[in-house]
Amino acid sequence: MKKAILATKIGMTQIFNADGVLVPVTVLEAGPCVVTQIKTVENDGYSAVQVGFGDKKEKVVEKDANGKKSVAHRHGVNKAQMGHFKKAGVSGKRFVREFKFENADEYNLADEIKADIFAEGDKVDVTAISKGKGFQGAIKRLGQHRGPMAHGSKFHRHQGSNGACSSPSKVFKGKGMPGHMGSVKVTTQNLEVVRVDADKNLLLIKGAVPGAKKALITVKETTKSGK
């Protein structure tokens, strides 16, 4: 892998391509990311680049004359994390991820990675946490068929048989049943980069991208190149 970046999802829109065809796209605010650590084979056993994305204030704990503590930015970057960022010469970051770049030795601490690492026509893999749907039935969750909708039907959206009752007298593992849906890590592969706005750090990717608005998105060059 040579190219990757962290982004947040803005939403969907549609644009016309050069042939006048209307194309649905997802708009991502990609970067700028900064290099917070460079891992080497000698020190860490493998080669990788750690990047940070999105500013986050430092958590500050102060004491008054009576020794009572007051906390500013309670959910901010703690002292240990801030030391890590200061060592790299960057401000506190909200998200930190690691990429195993093939050209990791070409990066330096505090280098910026922007949206222009990608170009129009590039194929990318996009990873995010999907939207949570809560507890759902087998029809919505797994696409099972519903029952007859006639007046005399005993069930409509009820799940079908779970298995024989006398033998084996149990429900096998992996049986599709109602349960929690969504809020899982999802990767959509081989999506096309339709447009890159380097000035505004925007990537326009063809089609839908998993995750809600403002969700953290990981964009990498595809592993299915040429397919």
Swiss-Prot record:
Spans annotated as Disordered: 146-167
Statement: the UniProt record of this protein carries the keyword Ribosomal protein: yes
GO biological process: translation
UniProt entry keywords in alphabetical sequence: Ribonucleoprotein, Ribosomal protein, RNA-binding, rRNA-binding
Cited Gene3D superfamilies: 3.30.160.810, Translation factors
Entry GO CC: cytosolic large ribosomal subunit
Pfam families assigned to the protein according to its UniProt record, in alphabetical order: Ribosomal_L3 (PF00297)
Family matches, as InterPro entries: Ribosomal_uL3 (IPR000597), Ribosomal_uL3_bac/org-type (IPR019927), Ribosomal_uL3_CS (IPR019926), Transl_B-barrel_sf (IPR009000)
Domain of life, source organism: Bacteria
Subunit structure: Part of the 50S ribosomal subunit. Forms a cluster with proteins L14 and L19.
Family: Belongs to the universal ribosomal protein uL3 family.
Protein role: One of the primary rRNA binding proteins, it binds directly near the 3'-end of the 23S rRNA, where it nucleates assembly of the 50S subunit.
Protein name in UniProt: Large ribosomal subunit protein uL3
Organism: Agathobacter rectalis (strain ATCC 33656 / DSM 3377 / JCM 17463 / KCTC 5835 / VPI 0990) (Eubacterium rectale)
Encoding gene per record: rplC
